[in-house]
Every structure is written in structure tokens, then in C-alpha cells.
Amino acid sequence: MRTRNDPNRPAQPDLLSAVLRSQLTELNLPFIRDHSHSVAQTAAEKQWSHLDYLTELVAGEAAARTDRRVQRRIKDARFPVLKTLDAFDWNWPTKINRLQVQNLFHLDFVAQHANVVFISGTGLGKSHLMTALGHAACLRGHSVLFTGAIDIINTLAAAQAAG
């Protein structure tokens, strides 16, 4: 390995690694920074081409960024507890329209700029279903805010009072 300044002098691997790590940090490429060595070892063992090695690193970086975006959306949504549709007990309440609820998870209402409101008595699973629906939306790249009607009314009243 040669340095850029003096092509006849070997580069110092530790210094080169430190410079590369610093540049990858500056470029905000943490996956590549943290995994380039292990992926390089795998590439050498499996005799990957340079393009295969680069493709693996970039794919890993892209996947890591997607995961971080999803986690940020979930955090920003302020779900009280994370719930999924799979965990919902369809045996109670007995009069719920399962197909109608499951169709909401296609998220067609988002593209139509429509709202979804669940109205029922206490303890019938409204919060569970809305949390699961919001979670599904976060996974598909949508921003969500989980809040109750009282909080919305209080926020609107405070905004109106502030002018």
C-alpha cells in the first residue's frame, strides 16, 4: 500500500485506518465505518470483486439508515406501548368488523388524506389497534403522532389563547 503523497513509501495501516474512519464519520457513514473491516475479510475469503465489496457496504449503510429512520418515527410517534395487529385478541370484543380493521392496515386512507377514528366503550382495544396501525404506518415510512382527543383539544385551546 502506498501513500498519496509519496508513491514509493508504504502507508501506515493504522494511520490510514484512522484517517478513513474519521472521513467516514464526517460523511455520516457509520455502517461502512464500523463494518468495512469485517466485510473486507468476508470479501477476501469469498473472493468478491471490488464492486461486490462496495455493493455490500452500501447496501448495509442503506439498510441501517432505513432502520434508524423507522426507529426515529416510532420514537417521535409517542406510542405509550408498542402494539401490533398480530397481538390483538379478536375474540374480544365480539362485534368488531375484523375485515374492516385489517383493511385499514393497507394504509389506503393515508394516500386519500382521510382520518381514522375508533369509537367504542372502555377496554375494547381502541388504543391497541390505533397503536398497531400507527406502528404499521411508521414501518412504511409515514410520520405518526399518537395522542388522545383531550390532548388535541388542550393543544388547540392553548394555541388559540396564544393567538
Predicted region positions:
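Charged, compositionally biased N-terminal leader segments and the immediate start
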Residues: 1-31
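N-terminal alpha-helical segment
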Residues: 16, 81, 149-152
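Amphipathic alpha-helical transducer elements in NTP-driven molecular machines
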Residues: 17, 26-29, 33, 98, ...
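Short hinge/gating elements
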Residues: 19-22, 38-42, 87, 115-120
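Interdomain "pre-motor" coupling segment immediately N-terminal to P-loop NTPase/helicase cores
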Residues: 21, 25-81
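Conserved, well-folded catalytic cores of nucleic-acid-processing
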Residues: 27-30, 39-42, 57-60, 64, ...
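AAA+ P-loop ATPase motor domain of ring mechanoenzymes
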Residues: 55-108, 112-115
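Conserved P-loop
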Residues: 96-163
